[in-house]
C-alpha cells in the first residue's frame, strides 16, 4: 500500500472503532486499529504521531462530514432570514445539540479530545465560529467570540454530565423538549448578559 492508502485505511478503521466505542476512549486501542486496518502497529505512530492524534483527526473528520454537512437552514448564512440574533443563535445551537445527542460516542470523544488539546482548527473552535455567524447585530467581535465560547463550553459540559444533567443543571437533556428549553434559556442568559436590554 502507498502512504496515502495506508493513512486512509487507518482513518477508516479508526472511525469504525470510534463509532462502536460508546464514547469510551479506552476501547480504542492502537492494536485494534492496526488489526482492523491491516497495517503494522508502528505505522499508526509514523503517520499520526500517536493514537490520540489519530483519534482527534478522525473525530474532526467525522464532525466536519456530518455536522457541517447539515449546517443550519441555508447556503448563504449572511442572507436576511428575518430572525433576530437571539432566535438565530438558538436555532444554530439547537441543531448542534441535537447532533451531539444523536452521535454521543463521537461527540464525547471529540469534546474530550478538544479539552485535552484546544486547537483553533478543532471541532470546538469551529463550532464557536459557526455560533459567531449567527450574531449579525451591533455586537463587537470580542463579545461575539465570548458568547460563542461560553455557549459551546456550556453545551459541552452539560452533555458530558450525561444522566446526571437533571441533578446538576436542572434539565433532563436526553429529552429533546428539555434540550430545547435549556438552549433557549442559556442563549437568552448569555445574550442578556453581554448585550443587556435597555
Segments (PLM) and residue ranges:
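Helix-turn-helix
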Residues: 9, 20-53, 57
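Amphipathic alpha-helical linker/stalk segments
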Residues: 58-88, 125, 132
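Amphipathic alpha-helical interaction segments
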Residues: 9, 53, 91, 109, ...
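Hydrophobic alpha-helical connector segments
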Residues: 71-106, 141-148
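C-terminal peripheral helix-coil segments that are non-catalytic and often amphipathic
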Residues: 131-141, 154-198
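Amphipathic alpha-helical segments used for helix-helix packing
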Residues: 94-121, 162-167
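Amphipathic alpha-helical packing segments from all-alpha helical-bundle domains
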Residues: 67-72, 108-146, 180-184
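Generic hydrophobic, amphipathic alpha-helix propensity
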Residues: 6-15, 33, 58-62, 66
Amino acid at each position: 500500500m502507498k502512504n496515502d492508502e495506508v493513512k486512509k485505511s487507518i482513518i477508516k478503521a479508526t472511525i469504525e472503532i470510534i463509532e462502536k466505542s460508546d464514547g469510551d476512549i479506552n476501547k480504542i486501542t492502537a492494536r485494534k486499529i492496526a488489526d482492523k486496518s491491516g497495517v503494522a502497529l508502528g505505522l499508526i505512530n509514523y503517520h499520526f504521531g500517536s493514537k490520540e492524534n489519530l483519534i482527534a483527526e478522525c473525530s474532526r473528520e467525522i464532525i466536519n462530514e456530518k455536522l457541517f454537512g447539515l449546517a443550519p437552514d441555508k447556503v448563504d448564512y449572511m442572507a436576511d432570514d428575518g430572525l433576530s440574533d437571539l432566535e438565530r443563535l438558538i436555532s444554530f445551537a439547537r441543531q448542534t445539540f441535537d447532533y451531539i445527542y444523536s452521535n454521543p460516542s463521537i461527540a464525547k470523544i471529540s469534546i474530550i479530545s478538544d479539552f485535552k488539546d484546544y486547537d483553533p482548527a478543532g471541532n470546538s473552535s469551529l463550532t464557536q465560529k459557526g455560533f459567531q455567524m449567527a450574531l449579525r447585530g451591533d455586537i463587537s467581535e470580542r463579545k461575539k467570540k465570548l458568547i460563542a465560547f461560553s455557549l459551546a463550553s456550556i453545551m459541552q459540559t452539560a452533555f458530558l454530565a450525561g444522566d446526571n444533567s437533571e441533578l446538576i443543571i436542572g434539565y433532563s437533556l436526553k429529552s429533546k423538549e428539555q434540550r430545547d428549553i435549556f438552549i433557549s434559556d442559556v442563549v437568552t442568559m448569555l445574550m442578556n448578559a453581554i448585550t443587556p436590554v435597555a
